[in-house]
Amino acid sequence: GVFAGTDSQRFHDLQEALNNPEVRAIFCARGGYGSIRIVGDLDFSQFIQSPKWIVGFSDITALHARVYNAGFMSIHAAMPKNFDKVDVESLDSLYAMLFGISNGLLESNSVYNKIGNTRGTLVGGNLSVLYSMRAVPFEYSYANAILCIEDLNEYRYHIDRMMQNLKASGVLASLSGLVVGEMLDMKQGADPHKYEVEEIILDAVKDYSYPVCF
């Protein structure tokens, strides 16, 4: 099926891991879809007493937002299903973050970068999930934040629509910076979009002075 179990089963398994003081980190096995169906009901009262790293990306963005609203950090990074496809540098970065060796940041030399200096809380995740979470109670606070986005297997015009939504709703104007992660396997629709994904994103933030990193 689409999910690894029923909503009840998945909720109770995750809640048990959040509550367990002996658990130091929770690695979500894979992305896809389904976290939004259970994360709103999670209880973080015991998690606050024994916080732990939560690791994942894509669909796990909704869980990251819940952790953020509980006042804690989490790690947007590779999951076990993808470990065999992830480069060593990224895995080393994940290890460094988990064990406090470094902040895990990687350098970028993209020609699309908009150079500058900024400060802010790093928030974000999968663009499609962020778009779907607009106005939910556990949506991120974007004021003076550095937003990080990534996505997979989307049409270019979908990326444009989501970025324009974030612009129209004031999210992009409130940021202090934007980091664009991997935008993999982007597709063209029946009417091909003439711009690259990077150009679509830069067009959405062209009115703002903050730096953009690809």
Give the ranges of each region predicted by the language model:
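Conserved anion/nucleotide-ligand pocket segment
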Residues: 72-135
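Oxyanion-binding "anion nests"
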Residues: 122-160, 166
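Structural motif
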Residues: 25-27, 55, 146-148, 179
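N-terminal glycine-rich "phosphate-gripper" loop used for MgATP/nucleotide binding
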Residues: 27-36, 57
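Short, acidic/small-residue loops that bind anionic groups at enzyme active sites
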Residues: 44-66, 73-79, 207-211
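C-terminal active-site/capping subdomain that shapes the small-molecule cofactor and substrate pocket
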Residues: 164-214
